């Protein structure tokens, strides 16, 4: 008799996606981050749901409701810090996942890649709105500064900002709508994840070599299920360690001060995972130019498949491109550091240099290096 997992209308979808799915035999640990992101999303939705049961999205009570969660709700402190640090873990996995895609040429699956970029934007929007909800100083001023950037859009900018604010400043209406969207977006992200997986399973996975692996496939279960479970354990151990030993390591102390529109914090900055984009924004003296550079710093990923001129898909056998890739990683770390520094000499010039190099590497140096490698291989 045929196994029920192969005949049941619902189970056979699960079976073809997670059990009998043919997978390349050479996948390294860099392929673990997709499933880790799934776990992060699950943790965020669960902890967020329980936090929403106790949170109030009103400017008068939002800060106190978060304090109440931490002090009076059973394991409320654990929920709050799991949610806050879970977001950091989410972005660590996201950036590593995107980095893996760039290194091994996974972007040649253009549908999967483009849905991934859409997912990145959706998760960033969710995280930004979530950061506003505790209604601390950095929440309020971060929301004010970032939403105010939209006023740089010609003609409609000012009206657009006031429409998003629901008034003439960030206030109760802004907080309420941000809470509504912050609750809704993760479910949209979940739907996009399903589309992402649908497109991925149309083509099958890439592998470290970048060579088609059709002749050498193995079933996803038990090989990669066990491997993924090990990844879950490692990540959840790291997250638990962060939450239980140093929950405020990645947060901003200013967010423990209730929001006050009359006092501006000395350094307004977003969470660490947005600092690289924030540094690029600050590097350009013109407001509209800065906003365009900020958007392009992420949207540039969409043109990476067009810029792929190498005869080889993966960077595994391309040492020159590898050097350039790791230089790009170093630039991103530099930008993250600069984003957290005050706007003064020498940080300004370092930020501007790193921003120029970031775009230069992706737009010009990587394609040129690929051409040189093609020539060296006499193709």
From Swiss-Prot:
One Pfam entry name: Cytochrom_B_C
Compartments, record wording: Mitochondrion inner membrane
Residues passing through the membrane, by range: 33-53, 77-98, 113-133, 178-198, 226-246, 288-308, 320-340, 347-367
Purpose: Component of the ubiquinol-cytochrome c reductase complex (complex III or cytochrome b-c1 complex) that is part of the mitochondrial respiratory chain. The b-c1 complex mediates electron transfer from ubiquinol to cytochrome c. Contributes to the generation of a proton gradient across the mitochondrial membrane that is then used for ATP synthesis.
Named cofactor requirement(s): heme b
Assembly description: The cytochrome bc1 complex contains 11 subunits: 3 respiratory subunits (MT-CYB, CYC1 and UQCRFS1), 2 core proteins (UQCRC1 and UQCRC2) and 6 low-molecular weight proteins (UQCRH/QCR6, UQCRB/QCR7, UQCRQ/QCR8, UQCR10/QCR9, UQCR11/QCR10 and a cleavage product of UQCRFS1). This cytochrome bc1 complex then forms a dimer.
Binding locations of heme b b562: 83, 182
Cystine crosslinks: none
Membrane-related topology note: Multi-pass membrane protein
Binding site for a ubiquinone: 201
GO molecular function list: metal ion binding; ubiquinol-cytochrome-c reductase activity
Cofactor stoichiometry and binding remark: Binds 2 heme b groups non-covalently.
GO terms under cellular component: mitochondrial inner membrane; respiratory chain complex III
Protein residues bound to heme b b566: 97, 196
Additional record remark: Heme 1 (or BL or b562) is low-potential and absorbs at about 562 nm, and heme 2 (or BH or b566) is high-potential and absorbs at about 566 nm.
Alphabetically ordered keywords of this record: Electron transport, Heme, Iron, Membrane, Metal-binding, Mitochondrion, Mitochondrion inner membrane, Respiratory chain, Transmembrane, Transmembrane helix, Transport, Ubiquinone
Biological processes, Gene Ontology terms: mitochondrial electron transport, ubiquinol to cytochrome c
Family: Belongs to the cytochrome b family.
Record-given protein name: Cytochrome b
Family annotation (InterPro entries): Cyt_b/b6_C, Cyt_b/b6_C_sf, Cyt_b/b6_N, Cytb/b6-like_sf, Cytochrome_b, Cytochrome_b_C_euk/bac, Cytochrome_b_N_euk/bac, Di-haem_cyt_TM
């Amino acid at each position: 008799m045929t196994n029920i997992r192969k005949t049941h209308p619902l189970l056979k979808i699960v079976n073809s996606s997670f059990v009998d799915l043919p997978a390349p035999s050479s996948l390294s640990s860099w392929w673990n981050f997709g499933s880790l992101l799934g776990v992060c999303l699950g943790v965020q939705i669960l902890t967020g749901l329980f936090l929403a049961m106790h949170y109030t999205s009103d400017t008068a009570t939002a800060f106190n409701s978060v304090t109440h969660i931490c002090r009076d709700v059973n394991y409320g402190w654990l929920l709050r810090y799991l949610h806050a640090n879970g977001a950091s873990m989410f972005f660590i996995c996201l950036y590593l996942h995107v980095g893996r895609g760039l290194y091994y040429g996974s972007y040649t699956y253009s549908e999967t890649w483009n849905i991934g970029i859409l997912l990145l934007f959706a998760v960033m929007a969710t995280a930004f709105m979530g950061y506003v909800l505790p209604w601390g100083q950095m929440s309020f001023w971060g929301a004010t500064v970032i939403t105010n950037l939209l006023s740089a859009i010609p003609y409609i900018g000012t009206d657009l900002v006031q429409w998003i604010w629901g008034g003439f400043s960030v206030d109760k209406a802004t907080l309420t709508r941000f809470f509504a969207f912050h609750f809704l977006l993760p479910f949209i992200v979940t739907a996009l994840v399903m589309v992402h997986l649908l497109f991925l399973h149309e083509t099958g996975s890439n592998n470290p070599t970048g060579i088609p692996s059709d002749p050498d496939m193995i079933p996803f279960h038990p090989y990669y299920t066990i491997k993924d479970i090990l990844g879950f354990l490692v990540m959840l151990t790291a997250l638990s360690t962060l939450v239980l030993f140093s929950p405020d390591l990645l947060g901003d102390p200013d967010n423990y001060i209730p929001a006050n529109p009359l006092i501006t914090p000395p350094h307004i900055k977003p969470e660490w995972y947005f600092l690289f984009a924030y540094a690029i924004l600050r590097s350009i003296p013109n407001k509209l130019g800065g906003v365009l550079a900020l958007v392009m710093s992420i949207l540039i990923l969409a043109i990476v498949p067009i810029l792929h001129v190498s005869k080889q898909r993966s960077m595994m056998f391309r040492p020159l491109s590898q050097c350039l890739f790791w230089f790009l990683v170093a630039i991103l770390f530099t930008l993250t550091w600069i984003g957290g520094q005050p706007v003064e000499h020498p940080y300004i010039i370092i930020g501007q240099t790193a921003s120029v190099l970031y775009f230069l590497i992706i737009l010009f140096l990587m394609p040129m290096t690929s051409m040189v490698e093609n020539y060296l291989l006499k193709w």
